[in-house]
Amino acid sequence: MNDLRYPIGQFTYKRPITEEMIDTWIQEIEDLPHELTKAIKDLDQKQLDTPYRVGGWTVRQVVHHVVDSHMNSYIRFKLALTEKNPTIKPYKEEKWAELPDSKLPVDVSLVMLDSLHKRWVNLLYSLEIEDLEKTFNHPETGETKLAVAIGLYAWHGRHHTAHITSLRKRLNW
């Protein structure tokens, strides 16, 4: 593994996006709370406060970041479903990771992630084909279709889970 920042590679997807791809991605989003919980199982406080790479976030910060990011994504989906191509508000994830709540026990975020994903997955399974074409506009990255955003956030969860599992493997935890 050459680039510790991208243990599963960067987000890519095949075009056209198929119904099977959407179903797989939604399943990955549904599975994330369990997979992330499994990835940190039995880690002690010192391990949770270990960066996954030099200059990177700690395992604890990664867990809290996933929840911060997925809360933002859930809201973006709701905005896109109720408004025409809304412009969403970006946030400074690196600064959020330094806020005091990122030092809380990881269980706080794991409970939030589980509840959030129950609601989000319920919403995702309710989407019609035409809903997948709806978009939101990110001021920095432009217009994103919900179909692509589903794939992106499925990847995002696997990406950060892999930060933790690859660290565990490298350090023999």
Swiss-Prot record:
Its EC number is 3.-.-.-. Its main location: cytoplasm. Disulfide bonds: none annotated. Binds 1 zinc ion per subunit. Zn(2+) binds at residues 65, 156, 160. It is found in: Cytoplasm. Belongs to the metal hydrolase YfiT family. Possible metal-dependent hydrolase. This is Putative metal-dependent hydrolase BCG9842_B2589. It comes from Bacillus cereus (strain G9842).
